[in-house]
Amino acid sequence: MLQPKRTKFRKMHKGRNRGLAVGTDVSFGTFGLKAVGRGRLTARQIEAARRAMTRAVKRQGKIWIRIFPDKPITEKPLEVRMGKGKGNVEYWVALIQPGKVLYEMDGVPEELAREAFKLAAAKLPIKTTFVTKTVM
């Protein structure tokens, strides 16, 4: 699963997920899966969607993951009283803003790419849409 090899600090503030997305264009492949909604994707969700796509295209073509879970999320153990410090890091998330391209694909027909992205989108908690590369 995706997570940083090392970080400057173990834990992070919660923060807010506002603002506009960076990386809104399909730049590596021909087809892409773009976020319409705002939210956060865990490393497990990113991997589940990648596996669904890979199986759908039967390992042909190439898939790029354009997001990386670099924010640690902490949780306290069950039945522990409030206080006594911040909890332990349990999983990693990627913050997603509307317009962000999540995955890209190349080397497969458009119908197959649409089907693969549809299966991947079912694994994700945010609303997404299918996009193609625009040549200028």
Swiss-Prot record:
One of its GO terms (molecular function) is structural constituent of ribosome. GO terms for cellular component: cytosolic large ribosomal subunit. The keyword Cytoplasm does not apply. PROSITE patterns: RIBOSOMAL_L16_1 (PS00586), RIBOSOMAL_L16_2 (PS00701). InterPro entries: Ribosomal_uL16, Ribosomal_uL16_bact-type, Ribosomal_uL16_CS, Ribosomal_uL16_dom, Ribosomal_uL16_sf. GO terms for biological process: translation. Keywords: Ribonucleoprotein, Ribosomal protein, RNA-binding, rRNA-binding, tRNA-binding. Part of the 50S ribosomal subunit. NCBIfam families: rplP_bact (TIGR01164). Belongs to the universal ribosomal protein uL16 family. HAMAP family: Ribosomal_uL16 (MF_01342). Binds 23S rRNA and is also seen to make contacts with the A and possibly P site tRNAs. This is Large ribosomal subunit protein uL16. The lineage of its organism: Bacteria, Pseudomonadati, Pseudomonadota, Gammaproteobacteria, Enterobacterales.
